[in-house]
């Protein structure tokens, strides 16, 4: 069942001025409940504008956004409750922290939901554990933490509201490879624990390939394609034509396959490549030796 749908979603900036521009152009989309969707596209493709419609930060110029089949703009009185159900983490969310302790910052959202203090504290502890923040860190000022820890605090603040849909705009931007993978694993842990739907905007084809089950490709404000990871990345020439690329390991394996190495055309992660190369090595070596 689709948890989020868009019907003819269109958004224009600067209507009636010489600077009028269509940022999202008649987008029809269905996001299944519990899915992990990667959203990719070159700069200016409409990714960020699209996701800001999904929790009502922007109102469509035309079309609808539906949450569980209900138009989110049908009743403005219910908009606040809807935003608790659809959480949005902006790029560089650590710039939005403001409380005097980490615990208070994470608790801000749940308190605004009107929850009992006991429930608020339970959510703080639970979410801190998901993102790897210790009890000692909860007592500290968030402004004294490292960049990666601040990022975790900000993400935890949204997770603590337990949104059914969690949308993240480049949550790993500016982090080193280890920090990037840790953040993505924590997002995956939240999904595993809550069954939430995850929408991840990313410029990293590798991150999307490792974690997403489906990929939405945006181009010039329109849906270029929306399909499984394998089906999207098999369209490498079409992706390159719109300024995107397949994961680097896929390009390496394509080159090896062109030179006679018997690899399949659905390798999109280093782990997949390693498995197939090891199998090929052992076949050619008769099962002898190690790699």
Q: Each PLM stretch: what is its role?
A:
Residues 141-145, 149:
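Conserved ABC ATPase signature
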Residues 118-136:
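Conserved ABC ATPase "signature" region
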Residues 220-221:
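Conserved ABC ATPase "signature" C-loop
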Residues 166-169:
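Catalytic Walker B motif of ABC-type/P-loop ATPase nucleotide-binding domains
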Residues 15, 64-81:
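ABC ATPase NBD Q-loop/coupling interface
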Residues 55:
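Helix-to-loop junction immediately C-terminal to a conserved catalytic motif
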Residues 162:
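Conserved catalytic motifs of ABC-family nucleotide-binding domains
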């Amino acid at each position: 069942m689709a948890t989020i749908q868009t019907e003819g979603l269109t958004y224009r900036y600067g209507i009636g001025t010489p600077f009028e521009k269509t940022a999202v152009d008649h987008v029809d989309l269905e996001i299944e409940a519990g899915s992990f969707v990667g959203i990719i596209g070159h700069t200016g493709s409409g990714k960020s504008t699209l996701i800001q419609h999904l929790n009502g930060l922007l109102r469509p110029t035309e079309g609808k956004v539906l949450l569980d089949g209900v138009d989110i703009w049908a009743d403005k009185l219910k908009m606040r409750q809807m935003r608790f159900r659809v959480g949005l983490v902006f790029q560089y969310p650590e710039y939005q922290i403001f409380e005097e302790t980490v615990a208070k910052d994470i608790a801000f959202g749940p308190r605004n939901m009107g929850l009992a203090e006991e429930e608020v504290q339970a959510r703080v502890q639970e979410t801190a554990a998901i993102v790897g923040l210790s009890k000692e860190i909860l007592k500290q000022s968030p402004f004294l933490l490292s960049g990666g820890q601040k990022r975790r605090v900000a993400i935890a603040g949204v997770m603590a509201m337990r949104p059914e849909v969690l949308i993240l705009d480049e949550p790993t931007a500016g982090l080193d490879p280890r920090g990037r993978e840790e953040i993505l694993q924590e997002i995956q842990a939240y999904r595993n624990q809550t069954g939430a739907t995850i929408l991840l905007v990313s410029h990293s084809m590798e991150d999307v390939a490792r974690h997403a089950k489906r990929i939405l490709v945006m181009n010039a404000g329109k849906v270029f394609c929306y399909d499984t990871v394998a089906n999207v990345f098999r369209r490498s020439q079409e992706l390159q034509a719109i300024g995107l690329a397949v994961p680097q390991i896929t390009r390496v394996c394509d080159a090896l396959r062109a030179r006679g190495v018997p690899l399949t055309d659905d390798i999109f992660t280093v782990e997949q490549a390693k498995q197939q190369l090891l199998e090929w090595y052992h076949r050619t070596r008769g099962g002898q030796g190690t790699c």
